[in-house]
């Protein structure tokens, strides 16, 4: 039964990823005054499936000098971790209801760094290695601010359990009292998922394609699936944290519909940003985090910690 539960979670995610690739190409197309994919199926709707068949039926080439085991394990690990991170998300009922769901998600996103590092190192190519090192430095750096912002939100939530966020936000979205945190969180999720304008890992002009330059066919498709599954997951996490949805136990499908609409809008903004902004320079990327975001998030975190202590002596304002 548990296997069926897992499959009912994984298959819709993979389907959503397939159509996200199509939506991205369509949006980029319309923003550049062209149509995008429109040949395969009605309005190009079957394009993702054609791409999948093409990629998975090609021969997976491997450089002769690469480290075989790591080279094969890295893409599988990337996708496995990307799909594992969905398990504690309440939609409205999570696959695994954890008390420390937030910590689990932080740990999983930290582990995702290893798949990138292994793929870059195992490829035995200087471009792949530089791309992987950039990705690791960027991901680890932005995880610092993500963790501090999460801590601030959880201080308002009063629990590490994600399902209680719906109760916390019954009256007011956390976006309003903590909008600076929400804005920094959104920009940090862009950097965490290696999306434009922070896609320095795959700077075509300098690194060919980044850490996955030596990958082809199936393994390359696995990296691609992992990246897009992470994008949707991060946006759903943002919607749960800052745009809390009211959960009525008698009508749980309303919660799901509401959450999916919010996630879709956030994902669209990811694609819109990709079409609108050029890539950052690497030193600007690091400057933004260590000199701007980190002091601000630390100050706001201290404020959220001291607020309940300062107001502890005030009688209840009802």
UniProtKB/Swiss-Prot annotation:
Keyword Electron transport listed: yes
GO biological process: mitochondrial electron transport, NADH to ubiquinone; mitochondrial respiratory chain complex I assembly
UniProt cross-references to PROSITE patterns, sorted A to Z: COMPLEX1_ND1_1, COMPLEX1_ND1_2
Catalytic activity: a ubiquinone + NADH + 5 H(+)(in) = a ubiquinol + NAD(+) + 4 H(+)(out)
E.C. no: 7.1.1.2
A single cellular component GO annotation: mitochondrial inner membrane
Keyword Transport: yes
Main EC class the enzyme belongs to: translocase
Topology term for the membrane: Multi-pass membrane protein
A GO molecular-function annotation: NADH dehydrogenase (ubiquinone) activity
Residue ranges of the TM segments: 2-22, 70-90, 100-120, 136-156, 172-192, 222-242, 253-273, 294-314
Predominant localisation class: mitochondrion
Keywords: Electron transport, Membrane, Mitochondrion, Mitochondrion inner membrane, NAD, Respiratory chain, Translocase, Transmembrane, Transmembrane helix, Transport, Ubiquinone
Annotated compartments: Mitochondrion inner membrane
Summary of the function given for this chain in its UniProt record: Core subunit of the mitochondrial membrane respiratory chain NADH dehydrogenase (Complex I) which catalyzes electron transfer from NADH through the respiratory chain, using ubiquinone as an electron acceptor. Essential for the catalytic activity and assembly of complex I.
Family the UniProt entry places it in: Belongs to the complex I subunit 1 family.
HAMAP family cross-referenced by the UniProt entry: NDH1_NuoH
Subunit composition and interactions: Core subunit of respiratory chain NADH dehydrogenase (Complex I) which is composed of 45 different subunits.
Name of the protein described by the UniProt record: NADH-ubiquinone oxidoreductase chain 1
